[in-house]
Amino acid sequence: MNTTVESTATRSFLAVLLVGVVAGVLAGIAMLVTMGILRLAFGWPTPTELIFDRLFPFLTVEFFISSLVKAGGYTPLKLQGVYGALAGQVAVAAIGGVIYSWYLNRLQRRQHWDNADDGIIDARGWRLIVPGVLVATVLFVILLWPTLITNYHGLPPARARIVASLEMLISFSVCGLGIMFFHALLSVRSAKQSIASPGVRTTGRRRFLALAIGAALAVALNGLLRRLYRIGTFSYDGRQYSGPGVQKITPIRPRDEFYQVSKNLIDPMIVRDSWRLDIVGQVENPQVYSFADIAAMPTVEQETTLLCISYGVGSGLCSNAIWKGVPLPRLLAQVKPKPNVTTVLFRAADGYYETFRFEKAMEPTTLVAHEMNGEPLPQGHGFPLRLIVPGLYGEKNPKWLTRIELLDEADGRLHRRHGCGFYKQQGWGRLGDAIPTHSRFDAPQVAGNHFAQPFILGKTAELRGMAFGGDRGISKVEISTDDGHTWEVAEISQPGTKISWSLWRYEWTPKQAGESQLVVRATDGEGKLQISEYRDQVPDGATGLHYVRANVVAS
């Protein structure tokens, strides 16, 4: 007799558990569909993106790089993170479903009530769901507060915080309602059934309805994820200016060939009319600018090269363009900075932030740009407004700019681990943010550490490449064809500007068959020779000379 009772109780418990899990999973899918629609239609950030941005600065650069290596690159790491986050959110919803199912079952047994009205949603479930949704929303708002200014359509930070909080409330509410709805469909009983009846019996019709709705939601989620993937950064993040096309090196890189790096799963798609730029902080005259305000100001054009801190010796994360915009000193003059200002903090629509010294901000070549190569900034390069800071690594040139804040030295944000910046806090650029001098071979085609095609003994070949000295210009480029023992001066065919790269050429006539080690080095505009000591790009940016092997064969 006892065995039968225990067996019945076990089956009843498992049935309650199963109903809760299924209801939670289906509600979790409904929540993800809601998040996807809000992200795609309105640019509202998902909790997944906000959590990533909140946690990222606290990861050590060593852990981040080891994760990249294990994943096989940044894009695979992003995808793994997305899959894990989606599964995690559904799992949490499933746990919520189990708690809800247990809660109702407990009330039934204590108070001896059942689903007498055969209604779709049991009103008594509100006692758990409403507080649960509110508590979850408040907790997420508190934990993610610094990142809530993110808005991928470019809303001002104050409005963005409200929208991000509302997104979580809506999504969590959908999850809570979904748990109640699917639980009711899966566990509904007739009023004639005793509360003591073993197990949880559902009608086939309502069970089918629940699963059909769940299947429709799964199809909708799949469609949303495919759409989001197509517009995501996966196809272009990490695009480098390297490979066979580099043999056609030009001084100005087309916009669609400019190197590209993004922390985002999906880059902002700013709505220009709703976008605003705030300039606040230690100023006497805070300002808010629309794009029309910025576009109406006097502009300058300048040729400037950007180089990523992840640029390795001889790699392609470096490109040159003509930027048009308003000098930052002109904007800052309008807000009247206070005498105690030491640092400028820049924030972007995607939650990115960066700082550098006020003196650098006041240099005439520091630009808030809205055009690139004669056209409006592309979405992937910061439309409608980005920062151009000659001489500093690309991470110091934030895209999708929405706020500029002037700080004094007492501001606590400047005294975080490693400094204040999205990547800076992780440990990048601990030795400084100024770009050291670089040079490389671009043509003939380079494959790894050797030229892709052999050279012909006694036949003159043209070597070409680039040299870049940050904001110091290039005064000389030298080539060695004997592993650095002797050097000859190359011709600088395109001098560029003080803040852009220079292109060089050198004619080499091989005089001996076999393998030769070619090396290039540059001297910057201040007369300083390129650092020859090799240093990996992690975490402080690469240094060292570009060595390439050449195979010389008889004709």
Feature map (PLM): residue ranges:
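Alpha-helical transmembrane segments of multipass membrane proteins
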Residues: 27, 31, 35, 92, ...
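N-terminal signal-anchor transmembrane alpha helix
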Residues: 19-43
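Extracytosolic (periplasmic/ER-lumenal) interhelical loops and adjacent juxtamembrane/interface segments
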Residues: 45-74
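N-terminal secretory signal peptides and thylakoid transit peptides that target proteins
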Residues: 196-216
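N-terminal secretory signal peptides
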Residues: 105-203
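Short, Lys/Arg-rich, polar N-terminal cytosolic tail immediately upstream
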Residues: 1-13
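Structured, non-membrane catalytic/scaffold regions adjacent to prosthetic-group chemistry
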Residues: 45, 90, 94-95, 99-100, ...
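Individual transmembrane alpha-helix segments
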Residues: 69-93
